[in-house]
Amino acid sequence: MQHTKMTQEVDLTISHHQIQVRSRDFDEELCQWGEINIKQGAVIHPGYLTFDPIPDDAFGAWVKLALTEVFTEDPNAQRRMVVPFDVLDPGKLELLSVMSDAVIELPLQEGRYALYFEICEDEEVYYRLTFVREEEYVQARYLMDDEWGGRAGEALAEGYC
């Protein structure tokens, strides 16, 4: 019997204020940050997401990915949001920043997911990306109040803005 991997950990070198998750080819236009994108800490396009990791400079951090049926909050989260993520091409699933990248090895299939993004801090900063399969549209929003201006329930704008 083949074991399907439902979790993955990536030691990612994060730089240029971005962690990207995508299921399509690189597109410079989809990487652009508008004033609202900067304020909310995310650029949201179908199959192409960019998150602000918050800390400045280049640094290494663990990014913990999971595919689950139900989202479970990390008690160490400092920021938490959910955004829609469309897997457009499972063969192009990547996690990256400017200086490093990794293939997403989770068994994500073409279709819609709720992607939960958490910035967590214990002894070190780490990130969690949790994919939950969804049939309905997912409203991008903050899920907790945070020290960078996020307010629980507040909607996040999609696209360049």
Regions found by a protein language model. Give the residues of each.
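Extended, solvent-exposed segments with strong compositional bias
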Residues: E73-L108
